[in-house]
């Protein structure tokens, strides 16, 4: 029996053509047929296929690297007229590229001239995310979401109510409108509990109830879709790509800003107040601001229906230049190492925190209140900063058409309140704000309370398309009216507020916090060998050493030694988080720990120098008393010692 065939359309810069193929055929089998429609001097090894026009951020694969991949494996099994884009290079172009010492196109080659397999070439996270949308027909079926989201999906989510003795007229086992369970998105319940935003899973159930109806037995459609405010490069109309051409199918629609009704995370919980005090100590000692990244976990939050909270266990302070009115971040070279230590401890990067403090000058520790209802809560520059960080930490969910939606990344600010006390405020940038930053539609303003809308006439990027942006406000007549957002609009439309707090009983993951924090040399606090030796080897007590490693900053510093293997490093992090004595004894008997102790003993703590002792007298040994003849030669006080040192250094 002959197998059925499907029609595939191909488009290159040389034109368009069609081919009849079998769904079971492999991609490399098309090489001969494709070459018939390309110029005679085309290099066969340079042919690549993409789901989007070449160079338009599609998933580009070289044809010779798709050996063993059939058409039906990538979803080309039943439809007719599916379109693929072809890129190629001539042999002359490849020769010119080689003579100039550059690789032709985007292909990489080995020393023998053979092309490198693109599947083993390292790719960025964004490129890896796009692969799923091409090789898998439904990206939401292949995405792997967090275990917390899986647990919340299995929950009933209903808000159970007890029997109302005044209104309920039924028996104890009956139910009526006054005692039946409520949906997690019930507006009356949220207003009663003063919950400003829906939790993510409550919002998900609200929109899914309108999108997918099980009683209709229809196919599943993800109810979530991230906003897209950029010109689509894969327009099916056939016109030249933007900026040469545009149509109603590929241009973004007008944007109507409105406050976001849900939030991805509902609460930020700091495991211990020491985390905040440690960050504040830098401001108290230097008078400048400080920024740190929050490492912790996401857990269920029972105060909100189907809520999520970020539990912070550690704050890592990256390299930065601190100033009175802000910070300037430097390149964070060991970010991957810190993330790996956090992963071994069961943590992940959950947010960022920074200070914005200015002493009130009263001498009582009070600070100025700079953020309030008449000024701003998060400036336009800080919203842009938070949006870019959320962009780097997308949330994987099977309820989105792209497999990703929003972000769980939070932003916290330490600033003064109306009473002059230091308080924490937690926020997230809205999903619309993240996409507007990604599309380069908005930019921060010198006025912190407003965000500027970009102009298409900007000389730096003439190919940018800026859609119309509107927002609603109460006009002078007391009526809600839609207003054009150009040139600027209030930042409140891009913000989502979160709650914060501390647990009633503090149970931090790391029980030791005495080791110096990284990148604090400017205030005289550095991570050095002698301080590490004092904590781990100088006291000679293994149990104290086991307790001392329960410090996130110390773990990150130990990774710079490279003395532990992967298994030993995992054991080290397990001891730091569980403080298990059995694992601790196993740790101190590993070769990596022995190497570390040797290094610290050779270059760690040294006996203190006593320059006032006479050179003819031997240096006193530890545990021995000074002889009477040596006691009278030491100075009577530190001031006398300092005076003698200055006298010896006198020029007269």
Swiss-Prot record:
It is found in: Cytoplasm, Perinuclear region; Endoplasmic reticulum membrane; Nucleus membrane. Keywords: Cytoplasm, Endoplasmic reticulum, Membrane, mRNA transport, Nucleus, Protein transport, Translocation, Transport. Residues 97-108 have a biased composition (Low complexity). Disulfide bonds: none annotated. Transmembrane segments: none annotated. GO terms for biological process: mRNA transport; protein transport; ubiquitin-dependent protein catabolic process. Residues 95-127, 604-652 are annotated as: Disordered. CDD domains: MPN_NPL4. One of its GO terms (cellular component) is nucleus. Its main location: cytoplasm. Gene3D superfamilies: Phosphatidylinositol 3-kinase Catalytic Subunit, Chain A, domain 1. Belongs to the NPL4 family. Involved in the import of nuclear-targeted proteins into the nucleus and the export of poly(A) RNA out of the nucleus. Has a role in the endoplasmic reticulum-associated degradation (ERAD) pathway. This is Nuclear protein localization protein 4. It comes from Emericella nidulans (strain FGSC A4 / ATCC 38163 / CBS 112.46 / NRRL 194 / M139).
